[in-house]
Regions:
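N-terminal alpha-helical interaction blocks
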Residues: 1-55
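Cys/His-clustered metal-coordination modules, chiefly Zn-binding fingers
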Residues: 51-127
């Protein structure tokens, strides 16, 4: 058995983190999971071209899926911090950096690390 390369480890971790956030929002349907897989394929090529970017993969996959969902369904993930008013999506910060977090720019707060949205939402789903 061959050891798993750092690239494959990072891609698997990014996939798992984004899928965890999708599951937390109860939006991990088959077509959405396909969006994750498409992003992973594209980011594999990207990081093969720029190996130093391997630590940025999780945030980039999260952003890719967020963009794909916006085009297909609407904003995701919705902010669990701000109560009433106009629902708005969280953003990933840093846009290109390690340790990505979901942030609410409206409230000016970090909401959760990518992969941990379930804890930020208190484990409950919103309707």
């Amino acid at each position: 058995m061959h050891p798993i390369s750092p690239l494959e480890q990072a891609l698997h971790a990014a996939r798992a983190l984004v899928l965890a956030d999708l599951a937390a929002g109860e939006v991990a349907a088959a077509d959405v999971v396909s969006m994750v897989e498409e992003s992973v394929v594209q980011r594999r090529w990207w990081v093969e071209q720029w190996p130093e970017g391997v630590e940025y993969i999780a945030g980039l996959v999260a952003q890719d899926v967020q963009d794909a969902l916006l085009e297909a369904y609407g904003r995701w993930p919705l902010c669990p911090v701000c109560g009433g008013g106009d629902p708005h999506a969280l953003d990933v910060e840093p846009e290109l950096g390690p340790d990505p977090h979901w942030v609410c720019h409206k409230a000016g707060v970090k909401v959760a690390a990518v992969g941990t949205l379930a804890s930020a939402a208190g484990g409950s789903s919103s309707s």
